[in-house]
């Protein structure tokens, strides 16, 4: 094998759509072994070995910003071709069916009324406010790594062992900053495809989806770029798949 090819660093496009601390994520993925380009250029996004989708703030605002740069189409095109995508924080939440937020004071939804925003629908589920006395859920927390046993119980093929958390101790903690999450996973039972591998965490009275592995599509509710050595290892695991 040509040594220049074998030593090539994977090229990651970090989608710049106005949401998220892109520089922090860029530096972390570079430390994980990839070359990172912050971009919204469609050709660059499609050409890259991997696409990183960050996101912070309100679900509705992130979806609006994503649509403004046709980011939803770019993500969909990559997934249709089996090309790797990693979503972080709200970048994970927008992959679900919808998000619900509650208006405060006056606004389109009215005081205290629920406002629904359609997501990308890659996974079934609704992003809702966590049930906890202290919000946001800010700080370090452990993750309950899934093993595919729920799929086996439904007569479906068990998911393969986690690649995302390979080499990471169960006691490791990751850094979360959020008030909303997906608290129910509606597992598909058609038996035709291997189900995603779902990982969970808890805060207050809520148990929520902390991360998902679904073929080329990975996502985390926590911030691996802010999660020390454990987060760096997770990013290295993703880069190794590119």
From Swiss-Prot:
One GO CC term on file: cytoplasm
Disulfide pairings: none
EC number(s) per entry: 4.3.2.10, 3.5.1.2
Residue ranges constituting the Glutamine amidotransferase type-1 domain according to the UniProt record: 11-242
Database matches in Gene3D superfamilies: 3.40.50.880
InterPro entries cross-referenced by the UniProt entry: Class_I_gatase-like (IPR029062), GATASE (IPR017926), Imidazole-glycPsynth_HisH (IPR010139)
Predominant cellular place of this UniProt entry's protein: cytoplasm
Keyword set includes Signal: no
Alphabetized GO MF terms: glutaminase activity; imidazoleglycerol-phosphate synthase activity; lyase activity
GO biological process: L-histidine biosynthetic process
Subcellular location: Cytoplasm
Record's keyword terms, sorted: Amino-acid biosynthesis, Cytoplasm, Glutamine amidotransferase, Histidine biosynthesis, Hydrolase, Lyase
Pfam families: GATase (PF00117)
Superkingdom of the organism of origin: Bacteria
HAMAP family found in the cross-reference section: HisH (MF_00278)
Function: IGPS catalyzes the conversion of PRFAR and glutamine to IGP, AICAR and glutamate. The HisH subunit catalyzes the hydrolysis of glutamine to glutamate and ammonia as part of the synthesis of IGP and AICAR. The resulting ammonia molecule is channeled to the active site of HisF.
Protein name: Imidazole glycerol phosphate synthase subunit HisH
GN (gene name): hisH
């Amino acid at each position: 094998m040509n040594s220049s090819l074998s030593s090539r660093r994977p090229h990651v496009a970090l989608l710049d759509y106005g949401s998220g601390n892109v520089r922090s994520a860029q530096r972390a993925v570079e430390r994980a072994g990839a070359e990172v380009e912050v971009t919204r250029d469609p050709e660059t996004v499609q050409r890259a070995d991997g696409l990183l989708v960050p996101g912070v703030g309100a679900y509705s605002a992130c979806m609006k910003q994503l649509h403004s740069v046709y980011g939803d189409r770019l993500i969909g095109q990559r997934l249709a071709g089996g090309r790797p995508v990693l979503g972080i924080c709200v970048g994970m939440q927008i992959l679900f069916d919808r998000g619900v937020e509650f208006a405060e004071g006056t606004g389109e939804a009215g005081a205290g009324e629920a406002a629904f925003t359609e997501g990308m629908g890659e996974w079934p589920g609704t992003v809702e406010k966590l049930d906890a006395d202290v919000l946001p859920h800010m700080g370090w927390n452990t993750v309950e790594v899934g093993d595919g046993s729920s799929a086996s119980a439904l007569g479906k093929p068990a998911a393969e062992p986690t690649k995302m958390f390979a080499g990471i101790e169960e006691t490791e903690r990751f850094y979360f900053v959020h008030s909303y999450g997906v608290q129910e996973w509606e597992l598909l039972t058609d038996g035709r495809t291997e189900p995603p591998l779902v990982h969970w965490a808890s805060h207050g009275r809520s148990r929520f989806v902390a991360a998902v592995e679904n073929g080329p599509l990975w996502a985390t509710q926590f911030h691996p770029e802010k999660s020390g050595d454990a987060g760096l290892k997770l990013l290295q695991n993703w880069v190794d798949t590119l």
